[in-house]
Amino acid sequence: MSGEEEATVREPLDLIRLSLDERIYVKLRSDRELRGKLHAFDQHLNMILGDVEETITTVEIDDETYEEIVRTTKRTIEFLFVRGDGVILVSPPLRTAA
């Protein structure tokens, strides 16, 4: 199989397949975002990510002023299994034309 045939995108999961062993961005339910290296995935978007940076955003309302208070929490996780039913969006790395 030639390199061109391997890089062909015929269905959405092909784009994710091309991102194996590269850093991707994953947006999850509950205002969680992940950036990490994609090691494996399946048709349900279950994923195994390595060297993950998780960002959790919470919005609270101040009881006195009724202003929104936005808090962002970050943590680093060495290895993470992501269940596919919580995935909203997967973004492959940006590729530039050579």
Swiss-Prot record:
PROSITE patterns to which the protein is assigned, alphabetical: SM (PS52002)
Keyword Protein transport set for record: no
GO CC list: Lsm1-7-Pat1 complex; Lsm2-8 complex; mitochondrion; nucleus; P-body; spliceosomal complex
Subcellular location as annotated: Cytoplasm; Nucleus
SMART domains in alphabetical order: Sm (SM00651)
Any one of the GO BP annotations: deadenylation-dependent decapping of nuclear-transcribed mRNA
GO MF term list: RNA binding
Modified residues (N-acetylserine): 2
Alphabetized InterPro entries for the sequence: Lsm3, LSM_dom_sf, Sm, Sm-like_LSM3, Sm_dom_euk/arc
Sm domain sequence ranges: 11-96
Highest taxon of the lineage: Eukaryota
This protein's UniProt keywords: Acetylation, Cytoplasm, mRNA processing, mRNA splicing, Nucleus, Ribonucleoprotein, RNA-binding, Spliceosome
Sections of the chain in a coiled coil: none
Tissues where the protein occurs: Expressed in roots, leaves, stems, flowers and siliques.
Function: Component of LSM protein complexes, which are involved in RNA processing. Component of the cytoplasmic LSM1-LSM7 complex which is involved in mRNA degradation by promoting decapping and leading to accurate 5'-3' mRNA decay. The cytoplasmic LSM1-LSM7 complex regulates developmental gene expression by the decapping of specific development-related transcripts. Component of the nuclear LSM2-LSM8 complex which is involved splicing nuclear mRNAs.
Family according to the record: Belongs to the snRNP Sm proteins family.
Subunit structure: Component of the heptameric LSM1-LSM7 complex that forms a seven-membered ring structure with a donut shape. The LSM subunits are arranged in the order LSM1, LSM2, LSM3, LSM6, LSM5, LSM7 and LSM4. Component of the heptameric LSM2-LSM8 complex that forms a seven-membered ring structure with a donut shape. The LSM subunits are arranged in the order LSM8, LSM2, LSM3, LSM6, LSM5, LSM7 and LSM4. LSM3B subunit interacts only with its two neighboring subunits, LSM2 and LSM6A or LSM6B.
Name the record gives this protein: Sm-like protein LSM3B
Originating species: Arabidopsis thaliana
